[in-house]
Amino acid sequence: MLLLLAEYLQQFYKGFGVFQYLTLRGILSVLTALSLSLWLGPWMIRTLQIRQIGQAVRNDGPQSHLSKKGTPTMGGALILTAIAISTLLWADLSNRYVWVVLVVTLLFGAIGWVDDYRKVIEKNSRGLPSRWKYFWQSVFGIGAAVFLYMTAETPIETTLIVPMLKSVEIQLGIFFVVLTYFVIVGSSNAVNLTDGLDGLAIMPTVMVAGALGIFCYLSGNVKFAEYLLIPNVPGAGELIVFCAALVGAGLGFLWFNTYPAQVFMGDVGALALGAALGTIAVIVRQEIVLFIMGGVFVMETLSVMIQVASFKLTGRRVFRMAPIHHHFELKGWPEPRVIVRFWIITVILVLIGLATLKLR
């Protein structure tokens, strides 16, 4: 929006041409989203408290979590508001990738909002029935996948890239839609499963989003892409503005979500942010790198799958409780220790993901 204004004003003063630079708009985007989160956060927390929109807690969970009951939830709406405003202000709104990621994020956020709302109204932790949640996730995920497939301008946009193996490129064809669906929906649910402790999900999300922003910038620049032997996706660089907004909004939310949390993001935030990460990774053809950098999300998801499969097949549980962060809590780890150690793991995995840029 402001880019259009800057382009108009450039005819009167050439200095406005500086807004053409992605790096500047990325910096302004992160600062805008961060400021909005910090500014609106206290107001949103008070509003949620007044309306008694509090977290429902599982009775079979760790006993330490019973004290969290009633903590304001649905704070993810704050993150999405900051992301949307910052992106609309600083991104090039003629770029289709910006709209795809923003729309997918908000649609998955809508699913989470309905889920959270039902939890608040019914005063239990079940929320929206799983079949309906997965149905709408599938509708929106497939819709995004089909759109990206139909609007692909170059073959590389539907090719699977294997990091560290520069000669391995797999033409997916229509299977691109299938892969994209699983990446978007899988990422959405993985982040949601991780969101069980104060600040546990948001910080890894911020770190992965920041790294994906780097991939977006490099992939959108033909010279950098050729030098690093990564896919050149014209227009993908504009997504650095969205990624920066996510980083800023996430850090602003963490100010209130850090232990002991004043507010939880709820499904409205977790489902949306996970879908955003998945969609961005698909666009820049870095699905495998997302799998690496989001290793904490993968670990949380696998722990649930293993736990369910083991119990159904043998009647025994592998972990004391799933997702795995609860397993460590029941082993006696204090909540802050679990959180920070998972953050450290994410830092390492993100660095490994970034290292794939040179390991070719």
Curated annotation (Swiss-Prot):
Major localization listed first in the record, in broad terms: membrane
UniProt-recorded name of the protein: Phospho-N-acetylmuramoyl-pentapeptide-transferase
Entry membrane topology: Multi-pass membrane protein
UniProt cross-references to PROSITE patterns, sorted A to Z: MRAY_1, MRAY_2
Pfam families: Glycos_transf_4
Pathway(s) the chain acts in: Cell wall biogenesis; peptidoglycan biosynthesis
HAMAP family for the chain: MraY (MF_00038)
Catalysed conversion reaction: UDP-N-acetyl-alpha-D-muramoyl-L-alanyl-gamma-D-glutamyl-meso-2,6-diaminopimeloyl-D-alanyl-D-alanine + di-trans,octa-cis-undecaprenyl phosphate = di-trans,octa-cis-undecaprenyl diphospho-N-acetyl-alpha-D-muramoyl-L-alanyl-D-glutamyl-meso-2,6-diaminopimeloyl-D-alanyl-D-alanine + UMP
Lineage: Bacteria, Pseudomonadati, Pseudomonadota, Gammaproteobacteria, Pseudomonadales
NCBIfam families: mraY (TIGR00445)
Organism, scientific name: Pseudomonas aeruginosa (strain ATCC 15692 / DSM 22644 / CIP 104116 / JCM 14847 / LMG 12228 / 1C / PRS 101 / PAO1)
